[in-house]
Amino acid sequence: MEYGFTQKLFGYFYHSSCMKQAAKQKLDINKKAIKQEYVSIMKNAKDIGKSRLMSSYCMGAYFIALNRKTPLSPEACYELYKDGLSSNKLFHIAVGNANSYLDKKKMPGRLKWSADSHLRRYENDWVVDIIEGTPQDDFELGYDYHTCGICNLCRDEGCFELAKYLCRMDYVLADMMQMKLTRTKTIAEGADLCDFRYGRK
């Protein structure tokens, strides 16, 4: 895919967050090698157009780069990623909170996104159904992902086993936004879909 401004921006954001955390932990890491690997992965990646989840696609690419260009285990890379993003104040502002995320006014846009995703214009992009919670449900917003861009990217890069670590990041992000995420299965673990259910804490 084209390595444009958006991919550079997300890459810079993830790289700076992780490298600040690496410095705190006094880790001996080749920053340049990680950055170059990220760029290489993004350029080789299948295009997903102007996907709403481009940030997640880039997050997956950077996680692969971290694993390839550091001596750290996947678990240690996950912890570095998690702690780096958690300590980034700008990231907290960018992800927002439960009130903004669960705003009913966003539902028409989400439903259009879902309909567009089922056209499968881009092989690696996410395909999603939106589930609106009812008063009888214990969630307000649900997603059933039938295709996962991160899983596709990891599979293309020959490291599908790394996808499950990024699944755990969803709980970190939900916690930052003061939301409760319930999920019973993921594509990364061999299921047919990922069933996200979000509610307020």
What do these predicted ranges mean?
Residues D28-N30, L72-A76, F160, K180:
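Short coil/loop linkers at secondary-structure junctions
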